[in-house]
Amino acid sequence: HAAFTVAHEIGHLLGLSHDDSKFCEENFGSTEDKRLMSSILTSIDASKPWSKCTSATITEFLDDGHGNCLLDLPRKQIPGPEELPGQTYDASQQCNLTFGPEYSVCPGMDVCARLWCAVVRQGQMVCLTKKLPAVEGTPCGKGRICLQGKCVDKTKKKYYSTSSHGNWGSWGSWGQCSRSCGGGVQFAYRHCNNPAPKNNGRYCTGK
């Protein structure tokens, strides 16, 4: 959840509005739910995290050269930890950090798909979730860990951690014109999903 919040706030720094803002609704129509720039972050649709409003706004921002400062190389590279976060904090500890020390893992749930945390209230077990999976590397069975939302044999960690660069998919069809009379615009979209970048692989460049 922290990663989504950080991405959301960076979006504001880059000039992005909330998806339900007046600007987005006037220019791109009805609000799209479960996107990173939603005014309330609950769950994110990982297959399409950015709304049309966000995609168009950030594209215009970068095309105008306002993002050139992001190209500066860091003075010093700070290597990340070799261990996955779930190897440091198991599912029970994640429940403690998310909800409080009295919480434990809700039994019978697939923590790799969604982490449910249990607490006893008035003699009954209650399970709560932030609608997010346990972090990468969380133990999910004997010799198994969570990787990309699945419970897999931990020997496959190298396969899941191998980088691959993204490549553009096919263009979609043109959308409706933004105006019925006079000058307007039409949009067509393609996605960086052929394949999608993985494990710090480069995102597609160009338009």
Swiss-Prot record:
Its main location: secreted. Its cofactor is Zn(2+). PANTHER family: A DISINTEGRIN AND METALLOPROTEINASE WITH THROMBOSPONDIN MOTIFS 5, ADAMTS A DISINTEGRIN AND METALLOPROTEASE WITH THROMBOSPONDIN MOTIFS PROTEASE. This is A disintegrin and metalloproteinase with thrombospondin motifs 5. It comes from Bos taurus (Bovine). Residues 165-205 form the TSP type-1 domain. The precursor is cleaved by furin and PCSK7 outside of the cell. GO terms for cellular component: extracellular region. Disulfide bonds join C24-C53, C95-C117, C106-C127, C112-C146, C140-C151. The gene is ADAMTS5.
